[in-house]
Structure formats: structure tokens, C-alpha cells
A protein has these predicted regions:
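N-terminal membrane-targeting hydrophobic helices
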Residues: 1-174
């Protein structure tokens, strides 16, 4: 899958649970690919794409480890969750992802019918984003706290800001 789709899936699914952890999950969702580049930079050896950095078992174990032991503000869990969303999204593709370093079996979801860059990839990822928007709007009340999207009209109505500040920021999303 393309990075934009990995970022969309990890960001949307994380925003429902913990909006403040979206940047960490986005860093984690791109990690399986940039870890390949980092390994090559550090050691000089190239590893195969969707190889050692794409082991499903490693990302699941990392997430379980962070969820069961002390994790400072769930930063580690968000990072490994982002990586796990990357692995799960790559499992939709024809190539699939390896289960573990000791297994030759590749993991596929829904038969692994997607090809990277084709329309099916975008339909699935943006469908997940749409579902997350619906779920998020259903479970959150109006005026809830979203750290990256400010409710300027609500702030003005409650008297928190004055009219000039509202006019200056009313069309600002972030």
C-alpha cells in the first residue's frame, strides 16, 4: 500500500480512541518501511521489502508488551499499533506479509487481492476513514475536545474569546 493510505488508516482509527496519540501512530504506521532504510544506512546491507520489518508477530508482540507493562502515556502502544495497522493493510495485497522469522507462510486478508496503487487500495483505506468519522461523530458530543481542531464558534459563544479573535480564526481548521 501507499504511505498516504497507511497514514489515513492509522490516523483515523487512533483519533477515535486517543486523538493526542495520532502523530505517534502515524510515525509507527510508516515505521516498517523507514526501518528498512535505517537498517541499510546503519549496516550498509539491504533487507528485502516486506521482510524482517514486516513480521506480523513482532508488531503484535510489541503492542502486547506495551499494553501489559508500564507504557508512558501509551506512546509505545500507539507506535506499535500504527505499525500493526501498516502490516494489516499490507496483508490485503498480493504479496502479503510474513508471519514470523521462523515461518515461510505469508499472511493475507481477504485473499490478498489488492495491488499497490490501484483503486481498491484507496477504496478500502478511505472506507475505513469514513467508518471512523461516523463512529467518532456518533460517540462524541458536540463541543468535545479534539486537540487538533478548535471549535472557534463554541469558544466565542461561551465567552472564552472575543469577536475579533473569532473573526481571525473562524475559517482556520488547525
Amino acid at each position: 500500500m501507499k504511505w498516504i493510505n497507511h497514514i489515513a488508516i492509522a490516523g483515523a482509527t487512533t483519533a477515535i480512541v486517543a486523538p493526542t496519540l495520532v502523530p505517534v501512530a502515524v510515525a509507527g504506521c510508516t515505521a516498517p518501511d523507514w526501518l528498512e532504510w535505517l537498517y541499510k544506512f546503519v549496516t550498509g546491507n539491504k533487507i528485502r521489502h516486506r521482510g524482517a520489518t514486516h513480521y506480523l508477530s513482532a508488531w503484535v508482540l510489541g503492542l502486547v508488551f506495551c499494553l501489559t507493562l508500564y507504557d508512558f502515556h501509551h506512546i509505545g502502544a500507539a507506535f506499535f499499533y500504527g505499525g500493526l495497522t501498516h502490516i494489516m493493510a499490507d496483508s490485503f495485497t498480493v504479496m502479503g506479509v510474513p508471519l514470523s522469522p521462523w515461518s515461510d507462510t505469508r499472511f493475507h486478508l481477504f485473499g490478498g487481492r489488492l495491488r499497490t496503487g490501484e483503486s481498491g487500495e484507496y477504496l478500502i483505506s478511505w472506507g475505513i476513514v469514513g467508518i471512523c468519522i461516523l463512529v467518532g461523530s456518533f460517540f462524541s458530543s458536540y463541543g468535545g475536545w479534539y486537540p487538533f481542531f478548535y471549535d472557534w464558534a463554541g469558544y466565542y459563544e461561551s465567552g472564552m474569546i472575543d469577536a475579533s479573535e473569532w473573526k481571525a480564526n473562524r475559517f482556520r481548521l488547525i
